[in-house]
């Protein structure tokens, strides 16, 4: 496998992208009000929030059973046709930062044998941000049973 390659990208067919989209799970960890507002915005609509565990919820009752709940929601979204598949692709994304600068990115398949978040291994791909290692086990548990992969779970 190449280090970075195209893959099938699933995009939501959502009519309400405001309900669908949320920021990465490792953001606003000390601001539960952000996540409460995201929950209210999503209501009962399909949402990325239903496919991830915000780190703000890690040490709350919401974390219990999250891995099973998320995997079931992923399966339901797949069965209900929530996504459209863009085969053998990359996805270009832009995010506007609070200071107005634009951060650009590419969603792709990555050979995880060539990735290191610690900065200590001689690999080709490294994390651009620090990783809080004690927050990894819940993400690993979610990925273990998940039929879909996301940049942030």
Question: Residue ranges of each PLM-predicted region?
Answer:
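N-terminal extension/subdomain marker
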Residues: 1-153
